[in-house]
């Protein structure tokens, strides 16, 4: 009789349904602590959560899955929502993520797709967050900033005026990390469109003249711009 009563109560009070994708996306972003940047959703399935992760214009989202049918479903969903480009998806092939080192602000792993943890951490930017789904919830791990990366906060490195950074990762360029607009300056033999670049706290700060490129005689439009130093 007790078993029957318990079963009756279970039927009368069903378990709560999983959170809808927009609510789940908001919860995951709050748990991550990331306020903007590049999100990669590993194991994106049909793209329902992938699309919801772009809660505002501060985020750009990319979904990855080995199942091409799921990628097609994700792309169809993104096109229907008119957000393709701001949110994208591609098929995962091989055992490496198709991303350069230190690029991603939030790596959301719903299904590891056979990718190991060192490879996941490789693509995270310093300060980036890895959220991994488990049977009991989501585990959070932060990639700490390496001690051998330095800031350049003044014209000559820092307030001391000594133009030597304490940075052992600086070296000749080996790959293109990211591209940021505008692609052309206003003129080739006048004042540079970009000047006074400094860095601090994982950000690049610079002054950019975004005035018309039709003629250098037109008024300038100087702007102070801040970008993520690792992915723009």
Model regions and ranges:
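Conserved class I S-adenosyl-L-methionine
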Residues: 34-51, 58-62
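Conserved SAM-binding loop
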Residues: 74-75
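Conserved SAM-binding strand-loop segment of SAM-dependent methyltransferases
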Residues: 82-94
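A short acidic, Gly/Pro-enriched loop at the edge of an enzyme's catalytic core
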Residues: 95-106
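Residue-level signature of beta-propeller blades and closely related beta-rich strand-turn architectures
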Residues: 158, 203, 210-212
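Extracytoplasmic/lumenal domain signature
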Residues: 167-190, 213, 217-232
């Amino acid at each position: 009789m007790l078993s029957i009563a318990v079963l009756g109560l279970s039927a009368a009070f069903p378990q709560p349904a999983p959170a809808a994708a927009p609510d789940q996306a908001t919860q995951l972003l709050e748990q991550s602590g990331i306020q903007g940047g590049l999100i990669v959703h590993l194991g994106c399935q049909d793209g329902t959560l992938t699309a919801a992760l772009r809660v505002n214009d501060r985020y750009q989202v990319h979904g990855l899955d080995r199942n091409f049918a799921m990628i097609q479903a994700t792309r169809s969903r993104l096109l229907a929502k008119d957000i393709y480009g701001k949110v994208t998806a591609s098929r995962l092939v091989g055992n490496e993520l198709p991303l350069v080192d230190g690029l991603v602000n939030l790596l959301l792993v719903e299904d590891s797709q056979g990718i190991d943890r060192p490879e996941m951490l490789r693509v995270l930017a310093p300060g980036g967050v890895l959220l991994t789904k488990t049977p009991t919830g989501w585990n959070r791990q932060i990639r700490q900033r390496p001690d051998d990366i330095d800031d350049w906060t003044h014209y000559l490195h820092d307030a001391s005026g000594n133009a030597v950074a304490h940075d052992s990762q600086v070296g000749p360029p080996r790959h293109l990390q990211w591209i940021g607009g505008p692609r052309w300056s206003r003129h080739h033999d006048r004042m540079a469109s970009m000047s006074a670049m400094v860095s601090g706290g994982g950000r690049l700060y610079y002054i950019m003249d975004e005035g018309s490129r039709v003629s250098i005689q037109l008024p300038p439009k100087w702007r102070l711009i801040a970008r993520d130093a690792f992915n723009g």
